Amino acid sequence: MGRFKGENRSQARWIMGGVSKGRGSGKSRKPRQAAFGQTGARVCPSSPQQDAVPRFRWPGDAECASSTHTPTMSGCKLPMGLCPDMCPAAERARRERERRLHRLEVEPGGRGNAPRADPKRTVKEYSRPAAGKPRPPPSLLRPPPVLLATVRYLAGEVAGRGDVSCAEVASFVADRLRAVRLDLSLQGVDDADAATVLEAALATLLAVVARVRPEETRGAADPVLLQTQVQEGFGSLRRCYARGKGPYPRQAAFQGLFLLYNLGSVEALQEVLQLPAALRACPPLQAALAVDAAFREDNHARLFRLLRTLPYLQSCAVQEHIGYARRKALARLSRALSTPKGQTLPLDFIEHFLALDGLQEARDLCQAHGLTLDKDRVVFLRGQYSEEGLPPPGAYHILVGNKLQGHTLEDVVMAEEGDIHRPGSAA
């Protein structure tokens, strides 16, 4: 078998669009955005006219049918919530009586025949509004400060629980955050306060969903439902941005998260490109646009360089697309390098190029696609490459998990991570 010598590594990088200046994948070229910066609470100049309501339909966003600003249409004023707790006392008592408490909500040591609700752990569950049913009284609605404290609790105390599977945590958190959005929509809340709550809720949801491994979703969590909840969170937040005049300090970051979560979507890109130019020029949105451009152009070398530089929350948003991008990159290498006798590349090149977590993950990826291994090299033989099923799940430590860098999820969610060191900038 022919050996793919060291001097030919540059050929592999050229094949993947990583060397020649201005070289893309042969598709239509898009302008490159290279400006990067912090994605925390940075105020970017914004126009009084914010983004339009998304033209594509958000899946199942039923709780927003009676949104915060229906008073402008009906002439009535919505009340403000008065409930001081994360869960109204009446609901706590009812669910305790009906034995419908989640194990994350019971008092320590109270998991026996009659578990007791812990007021400091019980969080209001989502209940779909029924047609013709009167609005809940203010005593059952949590005001914005309580809603924000609830989100902080979910991010700081629940999301990182090690005694419960990530799938169960994600299912619990997604339901409780859905109730947060519903409580918010039933009150006359100022847009700035609403945006603060919705941003924190969406950041928490993105993080807990990203931690769920595919093998954990059987029974404990429905991945489609979790994705729907994330899209509903984006829909609620972007409508809030569209209604208000701002400025919203984190809008650029969350518009960028929207694009990264929907990477490759024409509709999502159109929505972002319709934002005011001043907002699009903010570093977080420039970074997201650069990632989207590299993904569309199949410029895999640039894509994985950019992915390495993204902060933690942005990495959580894009994680779902990483496996697909790795598969496309490996397929392109196979098409370019496969010969009847076979050319080889070092596994450590594949590991670094695709930002994999170690040589074993590189072996697993190559073997899952039918490629032959020769010690620590992968052999590209014509006709061997195959794609069956989904790409193998990765651990994503390099591209996602390691980017908290000693900070907590609560820091990230509450925009208290401004001093987090960035992994670096891409060329």
Swiss-Prot record:
Phosphoserine: residues carrying this PTM: S425
Entry's localization field: Cytoplasm, Cytoskeleton, Microtubule organizing center, Centrosome; Cytoplasm, Cytoskeleton, Spindle
Keyword terms: Cell cycle, Cell division, Cytoplasm, Cytoskeleton, Mitosis, Phosphoprotein
GO CC annotations, alphabetized: centrosome; cytoplasm; microtubule cytoskeleton; nucleus; spindle
Gene3D superfamilies with a match to the protein in the record: 1.25.40.990
The keyword Membrane appears for this protein: no
Biological process according to GO: cell division; centrosome duplication; negative regulation of receptor signaling pathway via JAK-STAT; regulation of immune response; spindle assembly
Functional note: Involved in centrosome duplication and mitotic progression.
Similarity comment text for this entry: Belongs to the SAC3 family.
Tissues with expression: Present in spleen cells (at protein level).
Pfam family, one: SAC3_GANP
Protein name (Swiss-Prot/TrEMBL): SAC3 domain-containing protein 1
Compositionally biased region (Pro residues): 134-143
Highest taxon listed in the record's lineage: Eukaryota
Ranges for region Disordered: 1-53, 101-143
InterPro entries (UniProt xref): PCI_dom (IPR000717), SAC3/GANP/THP3 (IPR045107), SAC3/GANP/THP3_conserved (IPR005062)
Lineage: Eukaryota, Metazoa, Chordata, Craniata, Vertebrata
Compositionally biased tracts (Basic and acidic residues): 1-10, 117-127
Keyword Cell cycle appears in the UniProt entry: yes
Domain PCI: 229-397
Description of how the protein assembles with itself and partners: May be part of a SEM1-containing complex.
